Amino acid sequence: MTLDLIKIRRDLHQIPEIGLEEFKTQAYLLERIAEITNGKDFVEQRTWRTGILVFLKGSRPQKTIGWRTDIDALPVVEETGLAFASQHEGRMHACGHDMHMTIALGLLDTMVQVQPKNNLLFLFQPAEENEAGGMLMYEDGAFGNWQPDEFYGLHVRPDFKVGDIATNTSTLFAGTCEVFITFKGKGGHAAFPHNANDALVAASYFITQVQTIVSRNVDPIEGGVVTFGSMHAGTTNNVIAETATLHGTIRTLTQDMSLLIQKRVQEMARGIATSFDLEVDVTLKQGGYLPVENNSQLAKQLMTYFENASAVNLIDCLPAMTGEDFGYLLNKIPGVMFWLGIDTPYALHHPKMSPKEEVLSFAVDNISGFLKTRTN
């Protein structure tokens, strides 16, 4: 069948749902998948919570190729002014996952026309933004005997033009780790500081000291990011704060560097707590947000294919400090992720982010050609 990719994208754009709550999205996808695969006896499918797996059994399979798309949205109030804007208050496909899903359906529609030689798995994965859905599915055994031998996926990128595909042969995205810290002292009257223990002061010293991790503990060639974007302490001007809570992020291009920075953050927090004679609780949450590390051999093959595709402008790009839970799956299964240009002035997660829709047919045409080289 011939899909109306723009209509599908706009349908999906109107029903954004956050991770593990993608019920309408899953229902819509299942309807389209049923239409696409109708009468194809070599296709099987199953669901995992709000996720979907579609398996094309190869005619003479030697391996299984995987294509992954994420399906969740963000808690963002849309400001695009589009006629097909979000119908779910406070929810928006501001990270382009509506584009990802549409491309995946287009690829499925193309690849199902002729039974491939090798197996081909399409993964419609929930909860990329908040719960590392790829990790949850893998750890729960959702793949079973459909687990790919090679895994591929993409992410849209606003500052690249339609026709641009960008990747590299090493790390594409950073690993991310959330940091939650609570300093607990003793509250009291501002006039009697000697009878209290000010958690706000301790937290302030920590915020200053933690800046030295990147400047003095991290190899400048490797790099890293430590950012605390939230600090809450105290209730009014004349009461000494009993507690101070901090929420931050660690971003690195290698897991070893992430572990080093996590270790130093904990050591500094405990050191500050000791020096101020108060308590501290440190919680680190990395989960499935490992660095997205491309398999060098598979990446070279993918880049060679797109380099020879006349419609594609291939870019050998530097890593980005954005995070992606596909990193967990690529830590378990060799594969490649790449950027797809969508040419919009607004960044990912911006309430006015609006991709150029002509990229949909471009992506389906060119990526399906690559998948055919892997499955035949």
Curated annotation (Swiss-Prot):
Entries under SUPFAM superfamilies matching the protein: Bacterial exopeptidase dimerisation domain, Zn-dependent exopeptidases
Pathway(s) per entry: Amino-acid biosynthesis; L-lysine biosynthesis via DAP pathway; LL-2,6-diaminopimelate from (S)-tetrahydrodipicolinate (acetylase route): step 3/3
Class of enzymatic activity (EC top level): hydrolase
Active-site residues (renumbered): 70, 129
The organism's place on the tree of life at top rank: Bacteria
Tagged with keyword DNA-binding: no
Annotated InterPro entries: AcetylDAP_deacetylase, Amidohydrolase, Bact_exopeptidase_dim_dom, Peptidase_M20, Peptidase_M20_dimer
Gene3D superfamilies associated with the record: 3.30.70.360, Zn peptidases
GO biological process: one example: diaminopimelate biosynthetic process
Reactions performed catalytically: N-acetyl-(2S,6S)-2,6-diaminopimelate + H2O = (2S,6S)-2,6-diaminopimelate + acetate
Enzyme Commission number(s) from the entry: 3.5.1.47
Molecular-function annotations in GO: N-acetyldiaminopimelate deacetylase activity
Keywords, in A-Z order: Amino-acid biosynthesis, Diaminopimelate biosynthesis, Hydrolase, Lysine biosynthesis
NCBIfam families (UniProt xref): amidohydrolases
Family: Belongs to the peptidase M20A family. N-acetyldiaminopimelate deacetylase subfamily.
Physiological role: Catalyzes the conversion of N-acetyl-diaminopimelate to diaminopimelate and acetate.
Entry protein name: N-acetyldiaminopimelate deacetylase
